[in-house]
Amino acid sequence: MRLLLGVVAVAAMIAAPAFAKDADCYTTDDGDYPCNFESLDAAGSFEISAPGKPTFQVWIDRPGEASVGAVFEAGGRSVPLPGTYDRSEEDGACWVSRETEAELCAW
């Protein structure tokens, strides 16, 4: 019986949804704004979202490098943004596109 309860408890933890946390965000296009921050995986990938703003997903490819996608309207598809994004040396909460120099930050 204990084993069954243990298996059920582990399954519940694995199936538990991720929860968004309040954060402060910045993008080159939208400036500073309050947002929701949600971790996407163990590598450090994350998503930021806010009403009236695009939703951004930062997918960690390797330490310090990421691919970024954006959803520009509710229910829309994620569109890959140009270039690899590098973690900023000045602020580790920020990512900067090598190609366009667009910046995305979440604190």
What are the roles of these predicted feature ranges?
Residues 19-107:
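Cysteine-centric segments in proteins
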Residues 15-17:
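N-terminal signal peptide c-region/cleavage motif recognized by signal peptidases
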Residues 1-4:
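Positively charged n-region of N-terminal signal peptides that target proteins for export
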Residues 7-8:
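Active-site bordering "gate/hinge" segments
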